[in-house]
From Swiss-Prot:
It comes from Pseudomonas savastanoi pv. phaseolicola (strain 1448A / Race 6). GO terms for biological process: prolyl-tRNA aminoacylation. Consists of three domains: the N-terminal catalytic domain, the editing domain and the C-terminal anticodon-binding domain. The keyword Nucleotide-binding applies. It catalyses: tRNA(Pro) + L-proline + ATP = L-prolyl-tRNA(Pro) + AMP + diphosphate. This is Proline--tRNA ligase. Its EC number is 6.1.1.15.
């Protein structure tokens, strides 16, 4: 491809509304253009990368035995009402009414549509298992679209759905898809981690997320330094570092604490170790009209996902208001504690192992110091309530936990029979009786993968593509292309490289575009290999080669360039 025949839309300046690196570089490299909030047009440079991601996803899905289909982007409300998600889904679901006053939505996901297809096309266990996928545009009406393609409203997604006669069959396909996803991200050349995850609004049982490691990631992912254990922050089990509770050494005493409304103020004002304090968080209980207290150590954070999954706690999690606290306890949020609290309590595992700690007295501006379990109050229900922190023991007993930032690019779920029961998706089993189909669901954010790859692979000069994802593998830059010798050598090499199957971008812009601008553009775009043809080099029988990841170019004999490039480019 010659730049004279291509839409080379690079920009020198960074748009003011672009915050993350991938958004900045995709705009500057001429990969995308913004149409409206969260909506982007893919330009030729970007689309070449997107299609490469799609091709690898498609190859691995086909190899895993999945069948490609294509479902409508607009879905009838009746299916969502049947599954129960029409009412459950928030304003992210874009709802439409057609000219006949029938309700539809723009599909953010396709569980309902695929389940409807399965119940109409499958009738016997002999047709199972079956796994179907599509690569299609999705729409979610995000309240604050941001970070370019990282969190847009319209995006390209690969979503697959499998159907099974039993859970054992589902597990086999789930494991196969886990391997397929690992193969996909390995082939894409990304540093990634599969982690245990919560199922969220999709529902069901087991689930794993696939995260590309990047400091700009929105998610904290947790993994052991001594084993394969990995989970996202919502799912990671928090194991106390302490093995046993120390013996009590202090007497219980009631202290006036008028200026200690927060843990930080209590610690600073009374010179307390923060690990000797607790937070008492009151939330709505599962029993309507009731409240329950969740208690964690002062230096820990409540894991709202874990808390909302406790049978005693209302889901979604709702914090008690100040008025509710006053009515139920008679004190404000900054003075609450488990001692003499007229509410049921659940304490975190690490709180159970505390001694000589301080708690709110359930009286405004007062705290108890020197509190000890069993002596001063009984140990209530114990549960895992907190987020893990770096250095915690790994739940599998091997090593300690590390935490890194990640960008979620894939998620696989074992849905079980949630949708098949709601929508009566059944086949006749081996015994001739109807069986609700077990389902799996497997998604990859294809367009997000492109952005995540840039977040992981860029420098101050631009994007750093690997040979697999690069829009072009080679940038061929002639200096003084208007001269006969340079033009002849360039055109000959271009023909040889393209005939050998390389993807080459020949920068044939005229002399008004300086060599420095050409070099800067190709670095910005991130093309992995650069060959420069010049009068001086040709006079010495050489061309100049430079890798995107190297600082210095090297001279290559003209006769050796093709074999040299064949050894450099990973195909």
């Amino acid at each position: 491809m010659r730049t004279s025949q291509f839409l080379l839309a690079t920009q020198k300046e960074t748009p003011s509304d672009a915050v993350v690196v991938s958004h900045q570089l995709m705009l500057r490299a001429g990969m995308i253009r913004k149409l409206a909030s969260g909506l982007y047009t893919w330009l030729p440079m970007g689309l070449r990368v997107l299609r490469k991601v799609e091709a690898i996803v498609r190859e691995e899905m086909d190899a895993a035995g999945a069948l490609e289909i294509l479902m409508p982007g607009i879905q009838p409300a009746e299916l969502w009402q049947e599954s129960g998600r029409w009412e459950q889904y928030g304003p992210e679901l874009m709802r439409l009414v057609d000219r006949h006053n029938r309700e539809f939505c723009l599909g953010p996901t396709h569980e309902e549509v695929i389940t409807d297809l399965a119940r109409n096309e499958l009738n016997s266990y002999k047709q199972l298992p079956i796994n179907m996928y599509q690569i299609q545009t999705k729409f979610r009406d995000e309240i604050r679209p941001r970070f370019g393609l990282m969190r847009g409203r319209e995006f390209v997604m690969k979503d697959a759905y499998s159907f099974h006669a039993d859970h054992a069959s589902l597990q086999v396909t789930y494991d196969r898809m886990h391997l397929a996803y690992s193969n996909i991200f390995t082939r894409l050349g990304l540093k990634f981690r599969p982690v245990e995850a919560d199922n969220g609004s999709i529902g069901g049982a087991g689930s794993h997320e696939f995260h590309v490691l990047a400091e700009s990631g929105e998610d904290d992912i947790v993994f052991s330094d001594g084993s394969d254990y990995a989970a996202n922050i919502e799912k990671a089990e928090a194991v106390p570092r302490e093995k046993a509770r120390p013996a009590a050494t202090e007497e219980l005493r009631l202290i006036d604490t008028p200026n200690a409304k927060t843990i930080a103020q209590l610690v600073e004002g009374f010179d307390l170790p923060i690990e000797k304090t607790v937070k008492t968080l009151v939330v709505h209980a599962a029993e309507e009209g009731k409240l329950i207290a969740l208690i964690i150590r002062g230096d820990h954070e409540l894991n709202e996902i874990k808390a909302s999954q406790l049978e005693q706690v209302a889901s979604p999690l709702v914090m008690a208001s100040e008025a509710e606290l006053r009515d139920a306890i008679g004190a404000g949020a900054g003075s609450l504690g488990p001692l003499n609290l007229p509410l049921p309590c659940i304490i975190d595992r690490s709180v159970e192992l505390m001694s000589d700690f301080s708690v709110g007295a359930n009286i405004d501006d007062k705290h108890y110091f020197g509190v000890n379990w069993e002596r001063d109050l009984p140990v209530p229900t114990v549960a895992d309530l907190r987020n893990v922190v770096a250095g915690d023991p790994s739940p599998d007993g091997k090593g300690t936990l590390e935490i890194k930032r990640g960008i979620e690019v894939g998620h696989i779920f074992q849905l079980g029979t949630k949708y098949s029961e709601a929508m009566k998706c059944q086949v006749l089993g081996e015994n001739g009786k109807p069986v609700n189909l077990a389902m799996g669901c497997y998604g990859i954010g294809v367009s997000r993968v492109v952005a995540a790859a840039i977040e992981q692979n860029s420098d101050e000069n631009g994007i750093i593509w690997n040979d697999t994802l690069a829009p072009f593998q080679i940038a061929l830059i002639p200096l003084r292309y208007e001269t006969d010798a340079v033009r002849e050598a360039t055109d000959k090499l271009y023909a040889e490289l393209t005939a050998a199957g390389f993807e080459v971008l020949l920068d044939d812009r005229d002399k008004k575009t300086s060599p420095g601008i050409k070099f800067a553009d190709m670095e910005l775009i991130g093309i992995p290999h650069r060959i420069v043809v010049s009068d001086r080099g040709l006079a010495e029988g050489n061309l100049e080669y430079k890798s995107r990841t190297e600082s210095q170019p090297q001279a290559i004999a003209v006769a050796d360039v093709l074999s040299f490039i064949q050894g450099k480019v990973n195909r």
